[in-house]
Amino acid sequence: MPRYTVHVRGEWLAVPCQDAQLTVGWLGREAVRRYIKNKPDNGGFTSVDDAHFLVRRCKGLGLLDNEDRLEVALENNEFVEVVIEGDAMSPDFIPSQPEGVYLYSKYREPEKYIELDGDRLTTEDLVNLGKGRYKIKLTPTAEKRVQKSREVIDSIIKEKTVVYGITTGFGKFARTVIPINKLQELQVNLVRSHSSGVGKPLSPERCRMLLALRINVLAKGYSGISLETLKQVIEMFNASCLPYVPEKGTVGASGDLAPLSHLALGLVGEGKMWSPKSGWADAKYVLEAHGLKPVILKPKEGLALINGTQMITSLGCEAVERASAIARQADIVAALTLEVLKGTTKAFDTDIHALRPHRGQIEVAFRFRSLLDSDHHPSEIAESHRFCDRVQDAYTLRCCPQVHGVVNDTIAFVKNIITTELNSATDNPMVFANRGETVSGGNFHGEYPAKALDYLAIGIHELAAISERRIERLCNPSLSELPAFLVAEGGLNSGFMIAHCTAAALVSENKALCHPSSVDSLSTSAATEDHVSMGGWAARKALRVIEHVEQVLAIELLAACQGIEFLRPLKTTTPLEKVYDLVRSVVRPWIKDRFMAPDIEAAHRLLLEQKVWEVAAPYIEKYRMEHIPESRPLSPTAFSLQFLHKKSTKIPESEDL
């Protein structure tokens, strides 16, 4: 029998429907009837006939026609809002619902599984879990570890031993012993009281990453959670039932208590929850709609769910992966700019970089060689200025391997720390099943990921800083030998004038955002937790910096492609022509001024989806795999003994000597 969950004036009502031929209007009237029956204060209605209403789907807020049949208009167990005439939409209906609601009309439940054991999760795995590409299951080894760990907790309860967080209070109340008959209440109270975050909720992708990472850490078997509870949590993840987790409120020690408490609150059926099926709604109704029951916390389990660095680390994981993606593509964008500005490839000579063998520097120089003019990929643009009088390029072109290179090495360093953190037990106390005891420690302290993510923000920012200077060179006719601001009829048209200002503004914001949050600490919990990492802000800040870097490079990409227009009919190299074609598939050339923001967003989306890398990567890898010899075209402005033998041109001597 179909059933619908209907929201009327702050109340959720389960309305069964014995006949699918009934209409949306019937559902609305029946919901209002039940509301009037169950609410003493019914808003002045004496009967259903007094209420005039509209019916909307919670999923996307689509307005329904009252005459449509339920079997056509709605799915079984769907969530519906009845909006009574004269009422504003219930303020507690959906947090930030008008902002897109995070609903996916094309969402498909994943069929593939990823096995978690607490030891092998990668940053790529977690990002894919966040995108909803996999469900989760535990390895048999992980299940055994979890069971053995729980046996230790059960023994503590049975023997009435005084152990922190299990039979005592928390923080300042660590010496307060809790009666045995209140241990479960203790855990629920912990989750409720610590759910004190503020700000916008995490997106479904980020909440999914947070939940998946907490599952992975619990799978290590050092937190004392029961296998039954952990499997319940996994079922919720696999159904994409995601609690409302505000992004602000963690100081990064003792772990990420506030956000993880909000996560746990949804799992116990309280607070708000989101799923692709329901959108935002009360957690208990979302779980019910998916055939799931709220978790009933056993002793220690509330603490097991909320104590750890998973908020910092999951956001840090996204930051690392996005930083890696934009760093790769920054090399391609810069190479295209160098072509437009008629730069030389001499600065990327293998022998130069062998003398300063930083891994990132060598790799960036290699990418430039694989993309720019060579015997393998000749460029008509490069050939057109082969014998110009320019000796060397500006630092923003010539020093890309050195500047971009250290960013690559920074990302690699941070990724190593984040990967270690992904597979670390960060609870307190730790449960050692092999020793049959619990031990209090400080693995919950977020200093490692906090420091790493501050470093990541500082490192990745430099890509935007150098990109903005290249945009200046593209737009400045005295430096580029191109029309001012890359547009015809300058004066009538302003071209990239303010796009460059946008890039400058983003770079300036980043300079403030790069101040390390982890240099700060405030004593909390009555001086019990007297040093904290501020890692949550480090992670959120790093993501903001990375987004700005992506946007600045999107502007440079558009500017470089526009510069190509003024060099036609000359062609650049094959891989860079492919990049140009990709951009032109979503953004047409500027003939005259037009609304520019959508074009910047389109280019940003190409970078965010790694499309620029996808079109250039095959050429880079072919260059690598086939060991194509390095081309070293001769130039009159670079000294070469071989060149002197081939060409008799010399600097004229003064007659006075």
UniProtKB/Swiss-Prot annotation:
Keyword Cell wall biogenesis/degradation belongs to the record: no
5-imidazolinone (Ala-Gly) crosslink, residue number(s): A253-G255
GO biological process assignments: L-histidine catabolic process; L-histidine catabolic process to glutamate and formamide; L-histidine catabolic process to glutamate and formate
Phosphothreonine: residues bearing it: T396, T637
Gene3D superfamilies per UniProt: Fumarase/aspartase (Central domain) (1.20.200.10), Fumarase/aspartase (N-terminal domain) (1.10.275.10), Phosphatidylinositol 3-kinase Catalytic Subunit, Chain A, domain 1 (3.10.20.90)
GO CC annotations, alphabetized: cytosol
CDD domains: PAL-HAL
Alphabetic keyword roster: Disease variant, Histidine metabolism, Lyase, Phosphoprotein
Pathway: Amino-acid degradation; L-histidine degradation into L-glutamate; N-formimidoyl-L-glutamate from L-histidine: step 1/3
PROSITE patterns: PAL_HISTIDASE
EC number, as in UniProt: 4.3.1.3
Major enzyme class: lyase
Record field: catalytic activity: L-histidine = trans-urocanate + NH4(+)
SUPFAM superfamilies reported in the protein's UniProt record: L-aspartase-like
Modified residues (2,3-didehydroalanine (Ser)): S254
Record PTM text: Contains an active site 4-methylidene-imidazol-5-one (MIO), which is formed autocatalytically by cyclization and dehydration of residues Ala-Ser-Gly.
Pfam families reported in the protein's UniProt record: Lyase_aromatic
GO MF, one annotated term: histidine ammonia-lyase activity
Modified residue annotations for Phosphoserine: S635, S648
Assigned protein family: Belongs to the PAL/histidase family.
Pathology noted in the entry: Histidinemia: Autosomal recessive disease characterized by increased histidine and histamine as well as decreased urocanic acid in body fluids.
Name of the protein in question: Histidine ammonia-lyase
Originating organism: Homo sapiens
